[in-house]
UniProtKB/Swiss-Prot annotation:
The lineage of its organism: Bacteria, Bacillati, Actinomycetota, Actinomycetes, Micromonosporales. This is UDP-N-acetylenolpyruvoylglucosamine reductase. The gene is murB. Belongs to the MurB family. It is found in: Cytoplasm. Its cofactor is FAD.
Length: 363
């Protein structure tokens, strides 16, 4: 475990303490201290020691789903850089793998596809680390990690012990879990049970089915599914590219609103002049509605507010807010997010909620 020296008012902080270098938005202020953990033991030790010093703690891995304020973080940031994957159980039909929290997510997905392990292929191209996936219950193109996670190894900051939390106890819901709702647990590694198959799971997402030229419910070779997802994501600026400011983002900034039936019918009435809102009914009577559609129909199109903006909506996808220059501040991003949220609320009566974790800033 390595440590960047603590910054003080008398000494200019080391460049490694500036958090913009650790986020895909390239935004964020200074941290008091940055510690790098290259193993689960390092991660536990870094969090425990900072806690013993009475410091605030921020655990940061890929930095792809976090917005850090301009004031930075007045405490210790523990960078998760643990790597590794091992098979812990196998049978004729399935394989269970344990993956360290710092393992880059898309490298894991590529590995599973190459080994003909089915279950993660539609989650290709998502930036960030494996340890972040249960926190958000990451999902895309008809798959989410809650379907394949069997358990999560954690450090419990309350008891000071390590433990395994079974999937049934993780509180998985749409883009959320107990790990997002509380900072009590630090994810050390994640177990996934995957099918031993050269074919994808049934294609559930209509856009992906069209890209593959198959019917919803069909299965395709894993590599074909992965390639199609990567193409779709790249077309929306959702695959990291250092040369493309449309990818300097946290991906989808707002979650798709989940409405009860009455709320959905009210939305349909208010949207009657612009068309039927794209929606997906849930099994519990709720309806999930496209946030991208709501944003666009509220007058916030791709590229808003224009090419002169230091932060704008992506030119490829209305759900992504992007950093367009080296001069932007987090407050610029937050101001744009507030404008969009207020506009959607005024137009449709629906409140959008941010998907990323907000640190030292708020909408």
């Amino acid at each position: 475990m390595s440590e960047v020296p603590q910054s003080t008012s008398d000494v200019h902080p080391d460049a490694e303490c500036h958090l913009s270098r650790y986020t895909t938005l390239r935004l964020g202020g200074w941290a008091t201290r940055v510690v790098t953990a290259t193993s689960a033991d390092d991660l536990v030790r870094g969090v425990r020691e900072a806690g013993d010093r009475g410091e605030r703690i921020l655990v940061l891995a890929g930095g792809s789903n976090v917005v850090i304020g301009d004031a930075g973080f007045p405490g210790t940031v523990v960078l998760v850089r643990s790597r590794g994957l091992k098979v812990i159980e196998t049978d004729t039909d399935t394989v269970t793998v344990r993956v360290e929290a710092g393992e880059p997510w898309d490298e894991l997905v590529a590995h599973t596809v190459a080994n003909e392990w089915s279950g993660l292929e539609c989650l290709s191209g998502i930036p960030g680390s494996t340890g972040a996936t249960p926190i958000q219950n990451v999902g895309a193109y008809g798959q989410e990690v809650a379907e394949t996670i069997t358990g999560v190894q954690v450090y419990d900051r309350v008891t000071g012990t390590t433990a395994r939390i079974e999937a049934r106890d993780c509180g998985f819901s749409y883009r959320s879990s107990i790990f997002k709702r509380s900072d009590r647990w630090v994810v050390l590694s994640v177990d996934f049970r995957l099918a031993r198959s050269p074919l994808s799971g049934p294609v559930r997402y209509a856009e992906l089915a069209r890209a593959l030229d198959v019917a919803v419910g069909d299965r395709v070779p894993l590599a074909k599914a992965r390639a199609a997802v990567l193409r779709l994501r790249a077309g929306k600026g959702m695959v990291l590219d250092a040369a493309d400011p449309d990818t300097w983002s946290v991906g989808s900034f707002f979650t798709n609103p989940v409405l009860d039936r009455a709320g959905y019918e009210r939305l349909r009435e208010r949207a009657a002049d612009v068309g039927e809102p794209p929606s997906w009914p849930g099994t519990d009577g709720t309806v999930k509605v496209s946030a991208a559609w709501l944003i666009d129909k509220s007058g916030f199109g791709k590229g808003h507010p224009g090419p002169a903006g230091v932060v704008t909506i992506s030119t490829k996808h209305t759900l992504a807010l992007t950093h367009r220059s080296g001069t932007a501040r987090t407050e610029d991003l937050v101001r744009l997010a507030r404008e969009i949220r207020r506009g959607v609320q005024a137009r449709f009566g629906v409140t959008l909620h941010p998907e990323p974790v907000l640190v030292n800033c708020a909408l």
